[in-house]
Amino acid sequence: LKIANAVSTLNEFANGRGMVVIGGGGEWPGILGMDYGKRVTGCGEAVAMVKRAVAGEVVKWDGEVYKARYFQSTWVKGTPPIIYAGANGPKMIDMATRFADGTMFSDMILPMLPRTMGYVREGLAKHGREARDFRLNNFCAFHVKDDREVSFSEARREMIIRGWLEAPWYEPFLTPEEAAIVGANKHAFLTAFRTRSGDIKGVPPEICAKLVEGLSLAGDLHDLDRHVERLRTFAAAGITENALRLHDDPVRAIHIIGKELLPRLR
């Protein structure tokens, strides 16, 4: 309910452009030493409660995970903010298609799209919803900079958090032998992330280059055209939006997106 009030406040300040993603907690329960509990049920209940609250409705909820008694934000006005459910797997996607305005995928890669979009279609049909009314957003890393090597170094540094570098994320881009090297050296990627270094010890540069290409948008301005083609492929598959994760020097990154990337997408 605090999320609901916060995003409603943002929505009012932003003239109806507010939005929020509610997920199952990601890595945070593990970091905090907490049990993940009923992630799908809890996330679905949270999304449903927030949806009611941001519309100014009375929230009376007696769920398996959350409970509320007669909560109401009487001050909200205008078009409600967009409420996404963060989801990648089939159960979370089913929940998202039931309760949310849309879903945000995390680091979705092209080889995953056919199966994932199948889950979306199944969920929408199951819950009697139209695809045109459901937003599909892919969260992806944007590292494009004026200096190509700086961009690639940053992308290598952040690689461990691309799907937490689990096998389904890296195996499609590597040979079995290369995938085995990555699987045996995940700690090197974590060390690079923690020390803010682009040096992945024990992993050949050519393997790192394949991962950067497959799991992020990196390079300089000359690389934008091929990244645009990838984004268009996502769009053709049904993705309606992309959330670009910025890193170092976000001001310059925003300028690159506005002045260089968006004109290419139009």
Model regions: which residues?
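An alpha-helical appendage that flanks or caps ligand/catalytic pockets
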Residues: G37-Q72, L113-A236
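Alpha-helix-loop-beta-strand connector modules within alpha/beta enzyme cores
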Residues: A46-M49, A53, I257-R266
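Loop-centered beta-sheet repeat module
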Residues: G78-L124
